[in-house]
């Protein structure tokens, strides 16, 4: 496996999935679907989640998954934390109030059973300073470089 690849993924199983009005203005790819009910959209998201999880596992990659929350429409994109090979992790500040809710104590506890929390930048939210992990940064782990997009989330 490439040094840029991983052998272990963390996925959030969608409890809900809908356009997030709090983040839409900073996400070019997010669009509001009006021709399907929220229930149908959630069913499709859940089916896609299971198909993707199965495809990943069939290729020998370990998947750890936890259930999302109905009040967190973007929960399936867990941009609030990152883990590293040395078993450490960091928690990031999130711009949207409903994205901050994704940092469920139960999920943090689950992660800290395996990873040492070395930095929690949540305190920056009160100062309106945001750094949303993979929603605004791309990590080149081999060359130890981070590429960041110009965004209110970075």
Give the label of every model feature segment.
Residues 1-154:
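The feature marks the mature, well-folded catalytic cores of soluble enzymes
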């Amino acid at each position: 496996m490439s040094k840029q690849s991983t052998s272990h993924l963390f996925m959030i199983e969608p409890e809900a999935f809908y356009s997030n009005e709090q983040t839409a203005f900073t996400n070019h790819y997010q669009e509001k679907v009006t021709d399907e009910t929220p229930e149908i959209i959630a069913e499709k998201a859940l089916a896609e989640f299971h198909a993707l999880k199965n495809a990943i596992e069939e290729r020998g990659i370990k998947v750890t998954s936890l259930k999302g929350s109905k009040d967190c429409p973007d929960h399936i994109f867990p941009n609030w934390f990152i883990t590293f090979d040395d078993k450490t992790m960091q928690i990031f500040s999130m711009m949207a109030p409903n994205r901050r809710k994704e940092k469920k104590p139960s999920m943090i506890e689950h992660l800290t059973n395996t990873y040492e929390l070395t930095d929690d930048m949540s305190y920056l939210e009160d100062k309106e300073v945001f750094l949303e992990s993979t929603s605004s940064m791309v990590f080149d782990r081999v060359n130890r470089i981070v590429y960041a997009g110009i965004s209110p989330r970075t």
